[in-house]
Amino acid sequence: MFAHPFDHSFNDLFNQYVNMDTSSTDANKDVSFPSEFDQLFPLDSFSTDCGDQSPVISTVQHNSQPAQDWGKDLWSLSQNTGCSTNQDSFSFQDSTQPSTALDLSIGLEADATGHSQASVPRSTPSTPPATPGPKVKGGLFTPKTIRHHRESNDRRGLLRKQSFSPGLMRSSQLQKGSCRMAYPEAWAQRLQNFTIRSSDECLPLSPPPSDILVQQENVKHTPVQMRNAAEGFQGSTELPQQIDSGYITQSPAIPMPSPSANALAGQQQRYLSQTGTSALTPSPPSARDVFSSPHSSDPQSMPSWHSESLNTPAFQYTPELSDHQTWWSPMPSEVAQRHASYQQMIASPAPQRPVQAAANHGDFLQGGLMIQLDPTQFDISSSFPSSTIPTTANNHDNLAYNVEAHAPQKYVDASSFNTQAVPHPSRSPSISPKADTSPRHGSANRDGMAMKNAPRRPHGRKLSGQSTSTPKPVKTPNSLSTSPRGGKSVTVSFVNFTANDRQKILTGVAPSGSSKTKARREQEARDRRRKLSEAALQAVRKAGGDVEALEAVLC
C-alpha cells in the first residue's frame, strides 16, 4: 500500500529484536540490544526495570483475571517471539499489515489521548512496533507473586517449540499493533488503578515509582509520553491531583519555594522600610518581642530558612504575622500623636517618650484590659493636679488608649470615692480643701459626687444599726404588724442567733425561720382544730346523737 518504504527497515529491526529477546530472556536477564537498536532506544533493561512500565493488560487485570487468563495472554505473546525466529518462513504475503498497523496505531493513539499524545510520531517512524513487545512481555515478569513469574518462564520455554506459520505470525503482529494502540488508554488505567490500590500494595511493587527510577536513569522518550498522557487527562478532576501529588511532576516541586521565598523577602523589606519611616514610637520592636519571631525581621535569612524547611504551609504564617503588625500599628501611632499634643498642652514634654513606650508595651501585652491602672493612685493624684502633673498625664494616657476619656473617668471616680469616703469618713475633709485650690471641672464634679454619696451611705448604715437595737416608734412597721396577732410574740422583733434565743428558735420550727412564722402556724392550727370540732358537734346535733359524749372525746 502507501507505506512500502517502511517495510524492510521495520522487519529487520523487529527480527533483530525478537532474536535477541528469545535468546536472552529465558533466565530473566536484561536485554542487550545491538548498536543500531541502541541508537534508537538508549535503554539498559526492559525485562526487569521497564517491566513496571508496561502499559498493558497485566496490571489492569490483576484483580479480575485468574491464572488461566495469564496463560492465554502468555501463549499469544510467546508465539510472537518464538515464531519470529524462523526467518525463512517469516514473510508478509501482502506487505500491508505492519504499515497499516503503524498508521492505525498512530491515529488511535492520537484519538485516545486527545491532542497531547504526540510522542510516537515525534520519534522515528519505526519506534512504535518495537516498544510494546518487550513492554507487554516485561509486564508479565513483574506480577505480585513469584508463582506467575515461574509459570510464565515454563510456558514460554514449552511454547517456543510450537508452530512457526506465517498466519499465526500475522495474527500476532495484529495483536502487537492492538497492544500498541491501547498504550495510552492502558497508561491511564494503570495510573487510576495505582491510586486505587496504593493502600494495599507496597511502593516498590507498584508501577509509578519504578517509572521514576527508569526516567531518571536513561529513558529519553518515555517521560515525554508520560507527560503527554498526564496533559491529556487534565480535563478530569481527580487525576491531575493524583499525578501531581506523588510520582510524575515531582522534580519541578523542589525548586518552587525559591520564588515565593524571594517574594516574601521583598515583602519583608518593603514592610520594614514602611514601618521604619512611618512609626514614631518604639512599638514595632515590642510587638516582635511579643510574637517571638526574630527571623522575620531579617530579610537575608528568609530564603535560606524557607529552602531548608521546604514546607509550603509554613509560608502562610509569616505574611499573617506582618499583616497583624500592620493592622495593629496605626492605632498606637495615632494615639501617640494625639497624646503627644495633649501632654504638650498640660505638662512638660520631658517624660513623654518613656511614657508612650510603656503604654504601648502594656497595650500590646494586656490587650487593652487596663490591668496596670491603679484607681486609688489615679484618684488621689487627679484630685490635686497642681502638685503632680506628670503622674496625671501617665494615668490619662493609660485611660485613653482603649476607651474614650470622659465616661470611664466618671465611673471609676465614683466607685473610688465611694470606697474612700464610706469606710473612713475622716478622710473626706482632708481631701476636699486641697481640691479647692485648683478649680477644674473634673474635681468639681468629683466633689459634687462625694457630697451626694457621703451623707447617703452613713444614713443607711444608721438605719441598719437601729434595726438591730431595741424597738422604737420610727422602726415599728414590723413589730406593729406582729403585735396584734399573737400575744406571745409582741416583744419579739427579729430572731438573733444568740444564746438567749435558743429556746425561741428550737421549739418545733426550723432554725432559719422567725418567731412570727411559728406563732402564725400555731394560731392556724388552733383555728383549724376549733372549726373541725364545731363542725363535728353540729353534725352530731343535727343527726340526734349524743353530743356530750362527743365533746368528751374531742376535748
UniProtKB/Swiss-Prot annotation:
Record bears the keyword Transcription regulation: yes
Polar residues bias locations: 162-171, 259-281, 293-310, 419-431, 464-488
Stretch list, region Disordered: 113-171, 250-310, 419-488, 508-531
Function of the molecule: BrlA, abaA and wetA are pivotal regulators of conidiophore development and conidium maturation. They act individually and together to regulate their own expression and that of numerous other sporulation-specific genes. Responsible for activating a set of genes whose products make up the final two conidial wall layers or direct their assembly and, through this activity, is responsible for acquisition of spore dormancy.
Alphabetized UniProt keyword annotations: Activator, Conidiation, Sporulation, Transcription, Transcription regulation
Family to which the UniProt record says this protein belongs: Belongs to the wetA family.
PANTHER family: DEVELOPMENTAL REGULATORY PROTEIN WETA (PTHR22934:SF25), PROTEIN ESC1/WETA-RELATED (PTHR22934)
Domain comment, as recorded: Has an acidic N-terminus (AA 1-52) followed by a Ser-, Thr-, Pro-rich domain (AA 125-233) and a basic C-terminus (AA 461-555).
Source organism (scientific name): Emericella nidulans (strain FGSC A4 / ATCC 38163 / CBS 112.46 / NRRL 194 / M139) (Aspergillus nidulans)
Gene expressing this chain: wetA
InterPro entries on file: WetA
GO biological process per UniProt: asexual spore wall assembly; conidium formation; pigment biosynthetic process; positive regulation of conidium formation; positive regulation of transcription by RNA polymerase II; regulation of transcription by RNA polymerase II
Protein name: Developmental regulatory protein wetA
Effect of deleting the gene: Prevents the formation of normal conidiophores.
Induction (free text): Expression is induced during conidiation, after conidia had begun to form. Positively regulated by abaA. Negatively regulated by velC.
Phosphoprotein listed as a keyword: no
